[in-house]
Each structure stands twice: as C-alpha cells, then as structure tokens.
C-alpha cells in the first residue's frame, strides 16, 4: 500500500544558511562566485529528539544506461544491473532499523525502494516533491542531441546549471525549494530513523539544503546509483533548528574508487583522504592517534583493508602526517601498492613516492579524553571541541590543503593522471574537506569521519576547477569492522 505525503506550496527563492541559520554568501569549491541573491529559506523545523535520515539513489535505469536525460520523466525502469544494485543495497541495509521510508513516486525510484524495504511491515510513503529535477525540454534527449539542438543553452546547463533557465524555469533553484519542503515533512514524521529513496539531483539538494548550502553546490556532492548518504539531526534548545551533520556521503554498493568519471565527466586527477587506523587511545574514547601512539590491532586491520581497496588504483604519491599511526597506515598502503606490479606473470616493480607533511600533524594538545567512547564516534563530535583548538586546526588545514592540491598537475596530457593519497587524523581531514568545499571553520562539525575511512575528491576540470566530492567517510571496505548505516539503540556500552 502506498501512502502519499501532502505537498505544501513552494517555499521562498534560493539562498542558503550557514550552521545556525543565518543567510550568507558562499563559493563553490575553488571558484569565486557571488550567488546569494534571494531571501533566506525557512529554517529546518525544530526537533524533540535526534533523528537520522539515510538517502539512497535509485539503481541504474534504462535511460541511465542509454545516456539519456531523464529529469522528472517517468519512462525509464531499472535495468537488470539496477535491480542487482538495489538488492545489494537491501543486503547492506538488512540489519539496519528504519521507522519509515519516503520515496519518489517515479518508477525507477519506487522499484528501488520496494526492493530495499522488502518485507518491512510499514508502508512506503511516496512524496511527489522527491521526484527528480524538472528539466523540461531537455528531458528525453541523448546528451549529444542536447548539444546539437540547444547549443549554447545546453553548454550553460553543463557549465553553470544554477543560473541556467530552461523554458522560462530555473531547474536547480526550483529543486532547492522543493528539497526544503521535503525536509519539513521528513523531519516532522515520527521515528528516529528514516530512509529516503529518490534520485541523483534531488538527493544532492537534500544534502545541500540540510547543511545550508546554496545551488552553487549542485554537482559537487556526488550521488551514485544506490549510493547511501547519512545525515544526523540533533535537537537544539529553545525551539531552534536542529544541528546537522553529514555522517557519510555516497556509500556505494561497489568500490567508490573504481568509477573513472565524476558527475558524468572523466577525472584523471584525484585526492583520496585516508583516515589513519585506530590507536589504543582512540579506542578508549580519546581524540587519539597523535604523537607516538601506534596502531592497535583494529588499526592494523583497517590499514590493510584500505591498502586492499586502493589496489583498484595506481597511487602516485602518499602524503602523510609524521605521527606514528599515520606513518604505519601509509607504509601498509605503500607496500601493497609497490608489490601489486609483481603479483601477476610479468613482474614490473613500481615506486610510490611517500613523504611527510607537517600540516597534517595533530598536536598533543588535542589528546583530550571524552566522557565516553560514544562521544568520539558520534556525528558532529567536533562541535564539542574548544574554539581555540578548532581555530588552530582550521588555520593549519589551509596550508595542508594547498600542499595537496599542488601535487596535482595542471596539464591534461596522457602523463597527467595523478592519484594522491593523504593520510592523517580525522580531525585534520575534516578541515581539508571544508577547504575543498570553500566553507568556513563553522562547518567543520557538520561533517564526520571515522578511523579507517576514506573520502574521495575528484578534479575533472583540474586543480584550478575545484573538487567534486565523490564520497566521504566510506567504511564498507572494512567488512565486519565497517561502521553501520543506522545506530543501534541497544548495547551502547558494548559498541
């Protein structure tokens, strides 16, 4: 049985909020643009209790496979590959507990939701505002047909979508307004954990609007077929909007580094942020992994699992913090990379450049004991850090990010392929993510990273064009040691 959520009238026009709800201008990645031109959207509704929302994009559709522009049309269905992806997502989420499932009513999304939801006893809740972006005359066209028929307009859609008007409409701005309305219904629905199954663009808009990011972030936070993104909403006193933390972005059923394109475009340049493995102090509830703390057994396993995952890539250089846990993680990755060329019949030894970067080092002053282990692993834990320490980390992250970007070549020749792996503490990597997205220090608690996780940033337009975030806090490669999608309400002490 399908239950339909009511659709309210459109919300005010485009603007975005920084954490805390104030409207402010922002720039996309490394490009300097002023896009904050309109009144602020209404804030997220206040919450009485914490809520986790898991966003999943539908599996591959027939029009995905054909390279045809879908928009909000409802002619495509899941391919056999798409059905398989949805089944993999079902298995990935099988042990996770959800109180409700919202879905786009379009066939490709609805079918994905049906496969994932499976035998759960509650009804799916279709919401028409969760449909894919409305692309009007572009819908149904193959991409080369769009170029031939619409020329400059199609090029504008590719290069500057937030300012592109199609048939008198601004699709991205309309999408952002729709997403804001969806949050009103999703967050006021009862339950602590909600699954949302929808589409690429609308899921991007949901992530962005929850964090207060404007339309300039369209195509910056990637959503792959059946990729899962997790958002945590924490109630605030005085009826204020909840604080929001992106716990992970685009955790895909398959490896996040196997794809060679980013937002439909190939990318030969990539930075992979690897959070060092766990140490004894981090396992005991401290902001560990600083100074001389070595990896514990869990950290060794995490480092080896990450090294295996990165075998899908040819890593050119590994840049790590000089601290022991980071160096141990880097060494494990380097040894596997260099041995990979000799695993087949033809032995071709490889050399991977490995060097230390002081900017990735975390000072011993950050070794702060938390009240419990749960505090250090929960979303938004950076929000509890002393302001001066946060400020120090933020200043440090600027030079570190620039040093990593400088490792990428500007030219696009055959020799320009470059994969840089940066290894350090989750705290400094949070600063690097915010630098990539050209955000302020206040956004650092809006993201979360776990020990042993990876985050992938692609540069399809080169380092000067800014980064596209393919995924953050990916831990599926850790197998039985991966971080589950939903939080268990039982055995918290054991966790």
From Swiss-Prot:
Listed SUPFAM superfamilies: Phosphoglycerate mutase-like (SSF53254)
InterPro entries per UniProt: His_Pase_superF_clade-1, His_PPase_superfam, PG/BPGM_mutase_AS, PGM_Phosphatase
UniProt pH dependence: Optimum pH is 7.0.
Keywords noted in UniProt: Chloroplast, Hydrolase, Plastid, Transit peptide
EC number(s) reported in the record: 3.1.3.63
Active site: 58, 132
GO CC annotations on file: chloroplast stroma
Disordered, as annotated region: 1-23
Reaction(s) catalysed (UniProt annotation): 2-carboxy-D-arabinitol 1-phosphate + H2O = 2-carboxy-D-arabinitol + phosphate
PROSITE patterns tied to this protein: PG_MUTASE
Location(s), subcellular: Plastid, Chloroplast stroma
Regulation: Inactivated by oxidized glutathione (GSSG) at pH 8.0.
UniProt cross-references to CDD domains, sorted A to Z: HP_PGM_like
Protein name in UniProt: 2-carboxy-D-arabinitol-1-phosphatase
Biological processes, Gene Ontology terms: dephosphorylation
